[in-house]
Amino acid sequence: MISFESDYNNGMLPEILEALGKTNSEKTSGYGFDPYSESAKEKIRKAVDNENAEVFFLIGGTQTNTTVIDSVLMGCEGVICVETGHIEVHESGAVEAFGHKVITLPGENSKLTSSTLSAYMDTFLADETHPHMVQPGMVYISMPTEFGMVYTREELTALYATCQKYNLRLFIDGARLGYGLVSEACDYDLPFLAKHCDVFYIGGTKVGAMMGEAVVFSGMKAPKYFFTNIKRHGALLAKGRMLGIQFDTLFTDNLYFKISRHAIAMATRIHSIFQKHGIAIAYDSPTNQQFVVLSPSLYDALSKKVAFEIWERKSDTEIICRFVTSWATKEEELDELEHILQTL
């Protein structure tokens, strides 16, 4: 059975597997204090065009989100995100488990706009009782969004300016950052993104690595005791070089973006295949997540031969389903998907 369930259901890039194998017998210091981690950090600083950026390697996305948010915010502060934001919907209340309220606002096409944020902050500050409330201290967005959408240069610039106006830190979840940056909908590069937020992370788990995320403090200094907080949140890998080697490999010869482009090319073809067969597109995502509308009968038939996820049961007659591509997606798998659709 072919699978389009997620972008992390394969092992890892062959290049990473080879690099881990070659260095397997070496003995290095733990917790990221090794030559490979230092090399990876330097490559990331060059990639973001900021020699003063502080880089840390953590083991997974949820741990990264909770560690960054909990480290940056004071105990009485909360984090703003859209109603469909990953930390609100798909992280099991992890942020709130560490004492920070997730303050949700409506999104437009799954994105938070500067006008929505500004209106909320003006209303909040105009309330004379706001000192008795959870104080907004950070804005969280993901790039791309939960629905595969991409923030434009204009949108990101305006949002960051609004955050600065209200003294809010902007944190960008980049679990799928590579796919967002190489999509045709994106009109900026990694250095631009790094200059228009306070902290972000470069996703590895969903972009070719076995595991791991690289947190980059580009617009602010890392909070005091951030390394200690990484461990407190269960996000510090004792065999830290395993993360360093992976990111050192990903940021050698532009590999991170090469594999992201491959995934986008595969997703674009999936989009075309479904359109060719008259299947409605639910959200016009320009990235590696494609969302289509299936009837219950088509879902039942297709799911017997192809692995994918239900995103939302919209009605009795419409099921929104997600198909995801990655570095490992093959043209032959798309050929098979098209053949299956022709036979149903």
Where in the sequence are the language-model features?
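General beta-strand structural signal in soluble alpha/beta enzymes
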Residues: 3-6, 55-59, 81-82, 141, ...
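Conserved PLP-anchoring active-site segment centered on the Schiff-base-forming lysine
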Residues: 71-89, 118
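Catalytic PLP-binding core of fold-type I/II PLP enzymes
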Residues: 151-183
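PLP-dependent aminotransferase-class I/II
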Residues: 99-137, 141-144, 151-158
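Conserved C-terminal alpha-helix-loop-beta "cap" of PLP-dependent enzymes
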Residues: 75-76, 268-269, 273-342
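Conserved N-terminal alpha-helix of the aminotransferase class I/II PLP-enzyme fold
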Residues: 13-61, 83-88, 94
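Active-site C-terminal subdomain of aminotransferase-like
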Residues: 135, 142, 150, 187-286
